Amino acid sequence: MRILVTNDDGIHAPGLETLQGIARELSDDVWVVAPEYDQSGVSHSLSLNDPLRLRQVSEKRFAVKGTPSDCVIMGVSHILKDHRPDLVLSGVNRGQNVAEDVTYSGTIAGAMEGTILGIRAIALSQAYGAGGRANLKWSCAAAHGAAVIRKILEIGIEPGILVNVNFPDCEPEEVQGVAVSAQGQRNQALLQIDARHDGRGNPYFWLAFAKARFEPGNGTDLKAIAENRIAVTPLRLDLTDEPELTRFAAAFRA
């Protein structure tokens, strides 16, 4: 099995190294095509106004000056065009990609691009808690990643579907199993704009979430990782809401 590995945190990110290790538990044919620089939050964007620069870092390892979607396209349609990968793995992201994160995530987008190109694809992210990124427990994803991927491949990934996997903020032995979960929803009232001024008095802003108690919904990815379970969420490329499609069609016919 040929595996293409990408991410959005960049070619030198520790999560990419973690995912390479996971991939090598599954296959000895692992290729890496990742962004030259951090592309967190770029979602499914493409570089349409700038050329893509490709740099070979080492054997089977490439960096692209572009987005995660660019990287997957370059990997599938250029670097590996004569022998396409059988699986695209994107991650391991530095931080969870649950709830609304899915719409912003470059990690999810890397898997999404693989799905668009007709290749099975899985996005993987490692949550962190109050200790912040400095105390991120990569060992959790490293210990459980290969087994979760094997199970997903055994179940099968249908065309047009990608799978989002989130590892909880705990030690490997503290994981309470796997929860197949729906995409959750945060309390958006907690989103704040933090206004500041630089040394010259010019304003600038940070987006931030207020710290407040929040009870995630049952059966969601948010709930799963809060309970130290690995959240597995199938996502569909087709964003059409079928019930609403029927309702709108009936209304326009009236």
Swiss-Prot record:
Residues engaged in binding a divalent metal cation: D8, D9, S40, N93
Location relative to the cell: Cytoplasm
Catalysed reactions, semicolon-separated: a ribonucleoside 5'-phosphate + H2O = a ribonucleoside + phosphate
Predominant location: cytoplasm
Cofactor: a divalent metal cation
GO molecular function, one term: nucleotide binding
Cellular component, GO, one term: cytoplasm
Any Pfam family: SurE
HAMAP family per record: SurE (MF_00060)
Family from the record: Belongs to the SurE nucleotidase family.
Official protein name in the record: 5'-nucleotidase SurE
Organism (species): Methylorubrum populi (strain ATCC BAA-705 / NCIMB 13946 / BJ001) (Methylobacterium populi)
Upper classification of the organism: Bacteria, Pseudomonadati, Pseudomonadota, Alphaproteobacteria, Hyphomicrobiales
